[in-house]
């Protein structure tokens, strides 16, 4: 055809299978045989006709597969109108011109009549495991859901897993090291995408990534380094904080160490609040100790964007550290983080937690959709209960509080106030209480102090790191290895 050299009959005759959509076109097995013979006869006639050379281009004619045989225009006749040609060509798809030979196929056909050279045939048969026409599926939906924050890639060749650090509801945290420099260590949080989607936590994990990215430059907040995803998991790579969780290393605190740690946690919380973020998960497990024993906040899975002065109603957090207004199902704001800080301070000073009449502060089990009422008590009811109980309004504090210094009792009273509006809610307010008299509550000032020196001076015991057993560690690695 065109300018291509004539072939002999044995090479030019090809076997063509009828397209997959033949039923829709009204074709049958007999039609199929008829068209094979018709195509062969037309090809022989065209080879016998004199060829007309064109100096600048080749003339390519297509004939559509229809029930009525179509004839080529002899040289010199007028061509069909463009619209008619388009109707014929609409059934066919043009592949590519390779080595002066045309590759073309019937749209939707499983196998079709094709002119190909050897190289083209090899490349096409190797595509999709040598199955021509196999559908290229789009990326998994779970990838698209997280694509705005987590790029699709693999980091297996960059990091190696050292050991398991922590386990959670959605995944695990590993200590990993760089393969190019084993002295560079990181914390790798691996989360199951299926669990996040099942728990409707997609927006939550995206907020966590955004918040840690925005606030990670603060000296008392863990820095985020990288985010990525693969088919099954999300990965958050952060700086590694070597001395682990606060209470896993230290169980008894002097008043000077409490003053330092409460100040550092307060500065981190105040920074988050001023950035329009509520933390909602302040607890010892999320307070890590650096190599110099300064603190860093981690795990922003329950954090939320919330402007100062605004309220939210989501019931979340760890029960022991949840403020009364959360447990009562009332709207709450950033003051809940300061309550949690008070609970941590109470634990450091007395080794016990406050007891807020938990039989009254039970979780909401049901909320009526009509009026939003809850069976939990109100703040006013709690205050009334405390005032009617034996003793003073500090009845929920441990008895050991009575043996503390004035500074220790004062900081607990101001942080653990039932009424949120009367609670300490800023570093500025914290600076005015007795424990921070003549003390500069700033990041620069606190970083200039040495917790190690305070620990050594006050004879505070530091416990060794505790790791997961080998079986648990290996099971976690096997479950989350594909990073």
From Swiss-Prot:
InterPro entries: Kinase-like_dom_sf, Prot_kinase_dom, STKc_AGC
Phenotype upon gene inactivation: Mutants are viable and fertile but display NMJ overgrowth with excess satellite boutons, fewer and larger synaptic vesicles, defective synaptic endocytosis and increased levels of tkv.
Ranges annotated as biased composition (Low complexity): 41-54
Positions contributing to ATP binding: 165-173, 189
Residue ranges of the TM segments: none
Predominant location: cytoplasm
Keywords per UniProt: ATP-binding, Cytoplasm, Kinase, Nucleotide-binding, Serine/threonine-protein kinase, Transferase
GO cellular component: cytoplasm; cytosol; nucleoplasm
Enzyme class per UniProt: transferase
Signal sequence segment: none
Subcellular location: Cytoplasm
SUPFAM superfamilies (alphabetical): Protein kinase-like (PK-like) (SSF56112)
Active site residues per record: 281 (proton acceptor)
Pfam families, per database record: Pkinase
A Gene Ontology biological process term: TORC1 signaling
GO molecular function, one term: protein serine/threonine kinase activity
Listed Polar residues bias regions: 1-19, 55-73
Cofactor list: Mg(2+)
Enzyme Commission code(s) on record: 2.7.11.-
Function: Displays kinase activity. Inhibits neuromuscular junction (NMJ) growth by interacting with and promoting the proteasome-mediated degradation of the receptor tkv which inhibits bone morphogenetic protein (BMP) signaling.
Quaternary structure note: Interacts with tkv.
UniProt family annotation: Belongs to the protein kinase superfamily. Ser/Thr protein kinase family.
Name the UniProt record assigns to this protein: Serine/threonine-protein kinase S6KL
